[in-house]
């Protein structure tokens, strides 16, 4: 995927409001692969919604979102699987870890889809993020901060 385009996109919850001032909503915007973007705004203005739309997790918006010119509303489940496997990853606010599994098992679930990162690389991230001693610890027995770091490692196991 080389571009993500938003064309007059607006969360449904904001529909009918005349006072929307945004660099994202109700604009034409193209995000290009390899470029860095900062999305910064006040609470309740749609930052998490934007991520959820682009990830295909939610579709309660007006307007059009395209990946490389293709409207994401037309994507099949198989398309989404391939996109999430090869092109896009998301670190959810809710983390979405399996509490009964260990830190390693949670990361390996994602990495097994791509086989992109070696066990050695993943162990290095655990070390770097200060959770190497939690490798075999069930998520339910970890602090929220430790769980966040496991979720970050899991999100990094992508081939892009």
Role assignments for model-derived ranges:
Residues 72-89:
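ABC ATPase NBD coupling module
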Residues 138-148:
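Conserved ABC ATPase signature
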Residues 55:
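Helix-to-loop junction immediately C-terminal to a conserved catalytic motif
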Residues 63-72:
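Conserved ABC transporter NBD signature motif
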Residues 14, 108-120, 128:
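ABC-type ATPase nucleotide-binding domains, specifically the catalytic core motifs of the NBD
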Residues 100-109:
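Short coil-to-helix segment of the ABC ATPase nucleotide-binding domain corresponding to the Q-loop/switch region
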Residues 71, 119-134:
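Conserved ABC ATPase "signature" region
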């Amino acid at each position: 995927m080389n571009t993500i385009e938003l064309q007059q996109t607006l969360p449904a919850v904001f529909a009918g409001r005349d006072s929307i001032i945004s660099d994202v909503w109700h604009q034409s915007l193209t995000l290009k692969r390899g470029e860095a973007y900062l999305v910064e705004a006040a609470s309740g203005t749609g930052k998490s919604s934007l991520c959820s739309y682009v990830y295909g997790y939610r579709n309660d918006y007006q307007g059009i979102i395209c990946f490389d010119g293709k409207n994401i509303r037309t994507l099949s489940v198989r398309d989404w699987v391939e996109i999430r496997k090869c092109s896009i990853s998301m670190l959810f606010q809710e983390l979405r870890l399996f509490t009964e599994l260990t830190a390693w098992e949670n990361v390996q679930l994602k990495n097994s889809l791509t086989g992109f990162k070696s066990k050695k690389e993943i162990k290095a991230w655990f070390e770097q993020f200060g959770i190497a001693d939690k490798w075999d610890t069930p998520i339910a027995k970890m602090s929220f901060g430790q769980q966040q770091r496991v979720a970050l490692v899991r999100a990094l196991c992508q081939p892009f």
